[in-house]
C-alpha cells in the first residue's frame, strides 16, 4: 500500500478502502469497474457514487453496511425512508431487541384497544405514536441483526452455506 492518509474527516468509503490497506490504484483493480480517479472523487465527496458502485464496494471491501449508509444518507428516497443502521455487537443487539419486545408486550393490549374501531381518536394518538415508535425500534434492531449476520458471513465468522441452508428452507 502507498502511504496512509493523515486526512481528518475521512468519509465512509475512504475508511473502508483504508481498512483493507489498499491504495486507490489497488482498490480500482479490486473493484474492477471503478477507476482510481473516480474513487478519489467519491472519497473526497466531489462526486456522488452510483448505487451499483456501492454494491461493488460493499462486496469487495467486505462492508455490507456501505449499502445502508448510502441509502440512509445519500439516496434521496432512502434519506426519507431508510434509517441508518450502526454495526453493534451481537449481545447489544439482542439486549435491545429483548427490551423492545418486552415493552411491546406491555403495550399490545393498548394497541388492540386503539385499533379495534379502525380509527385513531384524538385521545389515542399519543399512545399510538409511542407504540409506532417502539415498533420502529424493533424494526431497526432486526435490520441491525441482519447487517451483523451479513458482516459475519463476509468475514468468514459464520459458515455461509450452512446459514443459507437454514435461511432458504
Predicted regions: what they are:
Residues 1-19:
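A short, Lys/Arg-rich alpha-helix, primarily the initiator
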Residues 19-41:
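Short alpha-helical DNA-recognition segment
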Residues 31, 42-43, 53, 61:
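DNA major-groove recognition helix of helix-turn-helix
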Residues 52-70:
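DNA major-groove recognition helix of helix-turn-helix/homeodomain DNA-binding modules
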Residues 55, 95-105, 129-143:
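Generic structural signal for well-ordered, non-transmembrane alpha-helical segments
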Residues 70-99, 152-169:
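Short, charged recognition helix plus adjacent turn
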Residues 86-89, 106, 112-128:
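Acidic, glycine-anchored loop motifs typical of Ca2+
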